[in-house]
Amino acid sequence: MDIVKFESESSQGLHELLVNLRKEFVNLAFQKKLGQCNNFSRFSLIRKSIARSLTVLNRRKREGKNA
C-alpha cells in the first residue's frame, strides 16, 4: 500500500488496519515456525505497512498538538 492511501484513510480506519496487519504478521510468524509459510516476502510488506500506518498516525498526532 502506498503512503498516499494511508494518508487518505481516517484515523479510526488506520487503527483498525494496524490491528489487522499485526494479527496477520503473528499468523505468518506461526506459519513460518510450523514450516507452512511459502511467501516470505509478505513479512517485509506487512512490516512496511505497519510502519507507514504508524508514521501517518504519529504525524497526525504531532500536528494536532502543535496546531
From Swiss-Prot:
<dbReference type="GO" id="GO:0006412">
    <property type="term" value="P:translation"/>
</dbReference>
<protein>
    <recommendedName>
        <fullName>Large ribosomal subunit protein uL29</fullName>
    </recommendedName>
</protein>
<dbReference type="Pfam" id="PF00831">
    <property type="entry name" value="Ribosomal_L29"/>
</dbReference>
<keyword id="KW-0687">Ribonucleoprotein</keyword>
<keyword id="KW-0689">Ribosomal protein</keyword>
<dbReference type="InterPro" id="IPR001854">
    <property type="entry name" value="Ribosomal_uL29"/>
</dbReference>
<comment type="similarity">
    <text>Belongs to the universal ribosomal protein uL29 family.</text>
</comment>
<dbReference type="GO" id="GO:0005840">
    <property type="term" value="C:ribosome"/>
</dbReference>
<dbReference type="GO" id="GO:0003735">
    <property type="term" value="F:structural constituent of ribosome"/>
</dbReference>
<dbReference type="InterPro" id="IPR036049">
    <property type="entry name" value="Ribosomal_uL29_sf"/>
</dbReference>
<dbReference type="GO" id="GO:1990904">
    <property type="term" value="C:ribonucleoprotein complex"/>
</dbReference>
